[in-house]
């Protein structure tokens, strides 16, 4: 049973990464309003609700219709769910005032990976979809059928950090031209086989298609753009003392989170060339507005129980009062 009494789904179980650590860092006042930006299968949300008092509230977000359906099993008046990206939290929460904490768990869930029809994994043959929200947008297969070679190479290089991005893009376009139907790379197996031929060297312990699949998923879902928008929205929504907790699973995400938090955690002399040249005292500089509370990794026991947790990194920051003071509520 879940912390809120909801029966767990027996199939395609998702192990919530850094569950206790994330909730401990997030919930600092039981009567606060909190945001779970990535409901997934509800592990973090249920644990947060278990920590809240009767006057607390939790608003969750998710793009995935399956996650929205799962959220419907939570019968708790303190809980609500928005079928939207967390990047839209500022608009969706307009009028609710500031919040006590925002949690973003950026990992793709095990049910999403393991469901062949979603097209996220090269381990299962299925349509090359890759959309988090299957009700809108174009699929990975549709994008590959129409994008030019340079764009395909750029996406695979920038979002997959793939050395053979140019060769993979050439192979995709060549297959497209040979087939004459404009879309030969239609399944996960099609793409995995094509990448395996294009990648000339192998990384130990990693399938050659790993980086390409990651890149296409990030692109199709605009994950990095959403992350940048979501971090800004979360920062703006947080009350003084509020917590921002972000769990990332690859270096591209973690780099964005690290830079965002660091930029708000130091005096902003670098933001203005005039300030860089001026002999200002620290007290004269724009003051930090976030306090960094730590960086965390799953322990050996958690990784042994859930190997997918190995790459997780959690960063935590606290909103500070602006110079001259500020309201905490």
UniProtKB/Swiss-Prot annotation:
Principal EC category: transferase
GO cellular component, one term: cytoplasm
Catalytic activity of the protein: cytidine(1402) in 16S rRNA + S-adenosyl-L-methionine = N(4)-methylcytidine(1402) in 16S rRNA + S-adenosyl-L-homocysteine + H(+)
Gene3D superfamilies: Putative methyltransferase TM0872, insert domain, Vaccinia Virus protein VP39
GO biological process: rRNA base methylation
Major subcellular site: cytoplasm
Entry EC number(s): 2.1.1.199
Single Gene Ontology MF annotation: rRNA (cytosine-N4-)-methyltransferase activity
Location within or outside the cell: Cytoplasm
Methyltransferase is among the record's keywords: yes
Binding annotation for S-adenosyl-L-methionine: 42-44, 62, 86, 105, 112
Keyword set includes S-adenosyl-L-methionine: yes
Keywords noted in UniProt: Cytoplasm, Methyltransferase, rRNA processing, S-adenosyl-L-methionine, Transferase
UniProt-listed InterPro entries: RsmH (IPR002903), SAM-dep_MeTrfase_MraW_recog (IPR023397), SAM-dependent_MTases_sf (IPR029063)
SUPFAM superfamilies on file: Putative methyltransferase TM0872, insert domain, S-adenosyl-L-methionine-dependent methyltransferases
Role summary: Specifically methylates the N4 position of cytidine in position 1402 (C1402) of 16S rRNA.
Similarity comment: Belongs to the methyltransferase superfamily. RsmH family.
Protein name: Ribosomal RNA small subunit methyltransferase H
